[in-house]
């Protein structure tokens, strides 16, 4: 396992969408610019550990999920299920 900024960005974008925020709204919640969030979501910029912590707390997921993609165990159960469904749907499209 290793840190992949593109995968981290995809997970952040998926969380943002599941929470019902657009990039402008979400960037305000986590105190960064919309353009910075956009760069993070496409993997052009790596989020700081402080930002990852803030996103994890806001989204109800673990840092393990954000960084490594491990399914959240201590976070919001409903959101965790939505993430699993979203992941499986994306995987199915690739088949």
Regions found by a protein language model. Give the residues of each.
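Residue-level signal for the short linker/turn that defines the boundary of a DNA-recognition helix
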Residues: 10, 20-21, 47-50
């Amino acid at each position: 396992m290793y840190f992949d900024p593109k995968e981290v960005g995809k997970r952040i974008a998926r969380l943002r969408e599941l929470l019902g925020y657009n990039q402008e709204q979400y960037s305000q919640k986590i105190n960064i610019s919309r353009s910075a969030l956009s760069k993070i979501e496409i993997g052009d910029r790596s989020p700081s550990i402080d930002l990852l912590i803030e996103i994890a707390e806001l989204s109800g997921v673990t840092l393990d999920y954000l960084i490594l993609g491990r399914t959240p165990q201590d976070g919001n159960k409903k959101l965790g299920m939505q993430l699993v469904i979203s992941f499986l749907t994306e995987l199915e499209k690739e088949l």
